[in-house]
């Protein structure tokens, strides 16, 4: 249930009855402080100004029309015209019951959309590195959230699987008599890539052969296509191991590489010319965009075909957006690509809109993100200054978590310890990233992310096991609790219940904005509220069985919400720690 949406509609109707225009915004928000109630309507100031009246006067008139019977126990005006809404304990109790009776914890299903999510996008013949982490896990959290809400989500792994480097790689593999690329590890390919590049730069005969191979590959020659497929297969097989370790939902079926759009490129260039959007300029084909200016203040030229006939990333991105609308029937397209690509995407999309390939009614959203930095505030590197491989980072996370878990659980069986270390280590790396606003850079710090205090994966995983332990001590199962009523009398019970019922609102924000840190903040706050509730409202030693069972049900919904919330982030939970 979305209480914010329910209250927004109630307040809006009351505002209209009080003389506000039909398009008025009630601006109902969750209250920042307990003394201001559970929700606050802040829209009176803006509307009162339009009506030429005092905000408090409008708020008083709104209250005469506002019917929150059975929802709120108290409604009051604060300050210049804020309306504070205190939820009725009986309303909270009823909806806690309903949430517990639902597999979805009472979360409603919005109108279903087809949403394409572009994320991860590693390059073929290169191992994934830390630069791929943010796109991969933030994008996957968005996908999990959207799917839970009931949308049809199409994962699009825009793999870099095309370009001149493939002629170079195939030529070098051939030279080394290692055409049977299927038996090679990706680590070998990285070495081959370096060696191939070195030969390409130093040996003109080799470079010429590589260029010829590119032409043959692009013309569809069977032998070269087969070699190219092998390179792609090895890369994606290795990447799948990383995805599985990260508990990310991407599979080989989700690969939609750059090569997919190659057949579309000549037609797009011809169409843009025919529509008068693209012109010849110094031998290249260019689209001039009034929205973007060059240093001289003139419309910026975006090249879509080079003088030699080659295409650019922009051309591919135009084709990509067109394909996602026309072929995949997207209602919405989300791109999890770092902030440095923003202008490039905006230019490609400006051309897409002008050409009529994707209507304005279909949002193209760049959910950009900042960089992962080391403690020195510079891009995260190895001690030698090299790029950190993602597999190496996950290995270190596992090793550090293994030591941490073994220290706290010296008698734990080896297999259980390994499972726990994996959940904690991988969870720590992911949660440290997901808990930060994606638009900002963040400092990668092992000590902070593996701490059992603060907004970290280990703390959240421990909070979940702590709630479960209450049930183990109670020696009661879910079926026995089902018939028991929920009764809310204490303030801490009400605060916990209200926060539990804000789960859907949190999911809605994450789905709309692509900001998993909002879910992390919600779960951390929920864990803190449960801690206060547990301390001040005895559960197992409650004054009677009715109160005991009611509090057990609040604990039960807390556990289910923590688990489901962490699952939308791709963070594994464990039963014991």
From Swiss-Prot:
Principal EC category: ligase
InterPro entries: aa-tRNA-synth_I_CS, Arg-tRNA-ligase, Arg-tRNA-synth_N, Arg-tRNA-synth_N_sf, ArgRS_core, DALR_anticod-bd, Rossmann-like_a/b/a_fold, tRNAsynth_Ia_anticodon-bd
SMART domains: Arg_tRNA_synt_N, DALR_1
Residue ranges annotated as motif 'HIGH' region: 122-132
One Gene Ontology MF term: ATP binding
Keywords attached to this entry: Aminoacyl-tRNA synthetase, ATP-binding, Cytoplasm, Ligase, Nucleotide-binding, Protein biosynthesis
Pfam families registered for this protein in UniProt: Arg_tRNA_synt_N (PF03485), DALR_1 (PF05746), tRNA-synt_1d (PF00750)
Signal peptide start-end: none
Record family assignment: Belongs to the class-I aminoacyl-tRNA synthetase family.
PANTHER family reported in the protein's UniProt record: ARGININE--TRNA LIGASE, CYTOPLASMIC, ARGINYL-TRNA SYNTHETASE
The protein, known as: Arginine--tRNA ligase
């Amino acid at each position: 249930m979305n209480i914010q949406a329910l209250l927004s509609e109630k307040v809006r109707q009351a505002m209209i009855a009080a003389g506000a225009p039909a398009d008025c915004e009630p601006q109902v928000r969750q209250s920042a402080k307990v003394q201001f109630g559970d929700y606050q309507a802040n829209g009176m100031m803006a509307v009162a100004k339009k009506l030429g009246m005092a905000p408090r006067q409008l708020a008083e008139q709104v209250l005469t029309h506002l019917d929150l019977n059975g929802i709120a126990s108290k409604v009051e005006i604060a300050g210049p015209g804020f309306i504070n809404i205190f939820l009725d304990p009986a309303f909270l109790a009823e909806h806690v019951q309903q949430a517990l009776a639902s597999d979805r914890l009472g979360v409603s299903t919005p109108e279903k959309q087809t949403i394409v999510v572009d994320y991860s996008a590693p390059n073929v013949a290169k191992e994934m590195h830390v630069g791929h982490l943010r796109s991969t896990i933030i994008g996957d959290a968005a996908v999990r959230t959207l799917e839970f809400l009931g949308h049809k989500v199409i994962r699009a792994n825009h793999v870099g699987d095309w370009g001149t480097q493939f002629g170079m790689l195939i030529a070098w593999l051939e030279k080394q008599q290692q055409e049977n690329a299927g038996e090679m590890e990706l680590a070998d390919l990285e070495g081959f890539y370096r060696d191939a590049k070195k030969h390409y730069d130093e040996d003109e005969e080799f470079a010429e052969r590589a260029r010829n191979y590119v032409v043959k590959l692009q013309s569809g020659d069977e032998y070269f296509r087969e070699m190219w497929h092998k390179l792609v297969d090895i890369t994606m097989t290795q990447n799948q191991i990383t995805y599985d370790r990260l508990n990310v939902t991407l599979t080989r079926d989700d690969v939609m590489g750059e090569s997919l759009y190659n057949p579309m490129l000549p037609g797009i260039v011809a169409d843009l010319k025919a529509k008068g959007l693209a012109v010849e300029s110094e031998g290249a084909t260019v689209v001039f965009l009034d929205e973007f200016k060059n240093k001289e203040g003139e419309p910026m030229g975006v090249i879509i075909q080079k003088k030699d006939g080659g295409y650019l990333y922009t051309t591919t991105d135009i084709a990509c957006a067109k394909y996602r609308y026309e072929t995949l029937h997207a209602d919405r397209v989300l791109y999890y690509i770092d902030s440095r690509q923003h202008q490039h995407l905006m230019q490609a999309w400006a051309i897409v809109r002008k050409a009529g390939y994707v209507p304005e009614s279909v949002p193209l959203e760049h959910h950009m993100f900042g960089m992962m930095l080391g403690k020195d505030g510079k891009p995260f590197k190895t001690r030698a200054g090299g790029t950190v491989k993602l597999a190496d980072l996950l290995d270190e996370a596992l090793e550090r978590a293994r030591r941490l878990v073994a220290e706290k659980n010296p008698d734990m069986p080896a297999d259980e310890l390994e499972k726990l270390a994996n959940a904690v280590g991988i969870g720590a790396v992911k949660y440290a990233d997901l808990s930060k606003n994606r638009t900002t850079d963040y400092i990668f710090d092992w000590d902070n992310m593996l701490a059992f205090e603060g907004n970290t994966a280990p703390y959240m995983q421990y909070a979940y096991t702590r709630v479960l332990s209450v049930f183990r001590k109670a020696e009661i199962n879910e079926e026995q609790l089902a018939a028991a009523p929920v009764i809310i009398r204490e303030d801490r019970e009400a605060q916990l219940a209200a926060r539990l019922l804000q789960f859907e609102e949190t999911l809605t924000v994450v789905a709309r904005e692509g900001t998993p840190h909002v879910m992390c903040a919600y779960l951390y706050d929920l864990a803190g509220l449960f801690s206060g509730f547990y301390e001040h409202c005895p559960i197992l030693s409650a004054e009677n069985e009715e109160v005991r069972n009611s509090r057990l049900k609040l604990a039960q919904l807390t556990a289910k919400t923590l688990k489901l919330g962490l699952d939308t982030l791709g963070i594994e939970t464990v039963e014991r720690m």
